[in-house]
């Protein structure tokens, strides 16, 4: 058993550790949570079905083989419409809240303008989640109970991996609605299956993006890079290639594995999960090769 750092034992998180971490890879799923607090549902102006459309449903299941391959897997249990862990902590719309606000707020981002800050203002349909303004105390409560435990744990996993192997690759796992799968294409009739986000090459070494793209394309899937999703807070915070810390975001078209209208798994979900298992094996090999510490030069 590896001596992993002491990790927060928190009901908001599902952290699955391998018996022995054998590769410098960590997998994270920030948006697959579906534990809706009853008080949140009472506040909501939209039905649960509308809130669930924001979930990256079943993504944690697709990547569930990670621990058996020697990789830690972290998944949020809280839903994205409650707290978005792929946002800055104070990336918020001040107009949502009643009462004193923390300073400074980062309220000028395109994501906040779209209603999709750390505490989202709108559901996936564009409908307002809340009937009116909500107490500003909500901000610190949700940071303390969800956002901070998630990122404290993720940071510990990444740093443990770095200290053990001399480098770390974080795979940030997501899914996208099929309606978004043509947004980055010239031909709107051409569906994209996978979008790889490396923050326009700033979040990971090109070898990682290329390896994932080759893997998916070899299996007949259509792949784009950084369009329409280049990555969010996670790629920006954890992607530091110059410091041997790399992050690659993977967006999967939900139509490949689920019935979006019914919010149910398709019969083919197991087949697709096995494909993802193969991808993780390939990325593990690539990480070992790319992050191999340089050997000292022999003395002359």
Q: Predicted regions: what is each one?
A:
Residues 1-170, 175-248, 252-300:
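N-terminal catalytic or cofactor-binding beta/alpha core of small enzyme domains
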